[in-house]
C-alpha cells in the first residue's frame, strides 16, 4: 500500500520497509519542496542535494547565481545516485543535519547525458 503524501507525483515502483520513507513508512512531509542535483551519496541512506537559485543584489540592480547544499534522507525504494535530478521535501528533523527527504527522482543521471 502506498500513502498519499500530498504531492502530485508518481509513487516509486519498488516497495521498501523503511519507517522514514514518506511513501511506505510513517514520515509526514510539510513545508518547502525543492528540486536539485545529487552531488554525493556516500553516507548510508543519505544524499547531498545541491540547488541553485538567483539572489537579487540591490546595490548593483542585478542577480547573482547562488547555491546551497542540503542533506536529505534517501529511502531504499527511491535510491537516488550521484547526478540524478531529484525532488526533496521538508519534514521533521531526522538527524542533526537532515530535515529533508527525497520524494522522487525526476531524471536519472544516464538520461541527462
From Swiss-Prot:
Gene Ontology cellular-component terms listed: cytosolic small ribosomal subunit
DNA damage found in the keyword field: no
MF annotations from Gene Ontology: rRNA binding; structural constituent of ribosome
Disulfide bonds: none
Keywords (A to Z) from UniProt: Ribonucleoprotein, Ribosomal protein, RNA-binding, rRNA-binding
PROSITE patterns, A to Z: RIBOSOMAL_S17
GO biological process, one term: translation
Subunit structure: Part of the 30S ribosomal subunit.
PANTHER family: 40S RIBOSOMAL PROTEIN S11 FAMILY MEMBER, 40S RIBOSOMAL PROTEIN S11-RELATED
Protein purpose: One of the primary rRNA binding proteins, it binds specifically to the 5'-end of 16S ribosomal RNA.
Sequence similarity: Belongs to the universal ribosomal protein uS17 family.
Listed name of the protein: Small ribosomal subunit protein uS17
Taxonomic source organism: Pyrococcus abyssi (strain GE5 / Orsay)
Gene this chain is encoded by: rps17
